[in-house]
């Protein structure tokens, strides 16, 4: 069974590029791609490129979809009226977030079935931004979670969650790249569930975990030192 879904992404976001790469490998082909071209997108793209510095970066969107008849639309803001009208006209069953700003209710109301996100951290324990860095600083396990989107920040029902095995050879940058891949794989699993019927739903306990902003530089450096010095508690080797 095919799934009619729209793929939303900030322009050339490396997280979204990896997700689209894996979706296409699994024959999960979006009906359309809507990329946001904005200063916010530029900042977020550079932020993730820094987090993945020295790691292999997926091809650009144009290369990934070369030879495929996937329409690509550009908007100034995924939350604006133009984007909403575009999505309403397409009537997707599902919106897939492949690295976006926080999406507002006016957009979340458009898909007939759901909006799905893949969070680069283990929910419900670490919501919000920079989960890899926070997990290192707080000495917590690394992983990813695919979940339905609700009006909160990373609070929607969980579809699938998986820990990432951390090796002593890992770096902060390699963990970010590996978690981008894991997140993308979980998104592919989630869309396969939806294409075949319904996906699992595990409600989150809102009293568990915390919602965090971008990690301050000094705390991030402490997390990196913990990993580099072998003081991280969750190695698999």
Regions found by a protein language model. Name each.
Residues 1-237:
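One-carbon transfer enzymes
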């Amino acid at each position: 069974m095919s799934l009619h879904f729209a793929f939303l992404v900030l322009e050339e976001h490396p997280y979204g590029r990896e997700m689209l790469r894996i979706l296409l490998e699994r024959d999960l082909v979006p009906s359309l791609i809507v990329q946001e071209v904005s200063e916010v997108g530029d900042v977020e793209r550079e932020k993730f490129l820094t987090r993945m510095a020295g790691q292999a970066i997926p091809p650009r969107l144009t290369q990934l979809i070369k030879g495929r008849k996937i329409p690509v639309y550009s908007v100034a803001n995924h939350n604006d009226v133009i984007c909403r009208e575009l999505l309403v006209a397409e009537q997707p069953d599902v919106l897939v977030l492949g690295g976006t700003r926080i999406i507002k209710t006016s957009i979340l109301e458009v898909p007939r079935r759901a909006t799905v996100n893949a969070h680069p951290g283990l929910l419900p324990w670490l919501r919000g931004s920079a989960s890899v860095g926070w997990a290192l600083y707080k000495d917590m396990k690394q992983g990813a979670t695919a979940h339905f989107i609700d009006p909160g920040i990373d609070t929607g029902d969980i579809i699938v969650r998986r820990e990432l095995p951390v090796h002593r050879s890992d770096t902060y940058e390699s963990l970010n790249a590996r978690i981008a891949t894991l997140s993308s794989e979980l998104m592919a699993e989630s869309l396969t569930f939806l294409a075949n019927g319904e996906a699992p739903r595990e409600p989150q306990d809102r009293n568990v975990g915390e919602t965090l902003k971008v990690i301050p530089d000094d705390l991030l450096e402490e997390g990196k030192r913990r990993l580099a010095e072998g003081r991280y508690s969750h190695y698999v080797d």
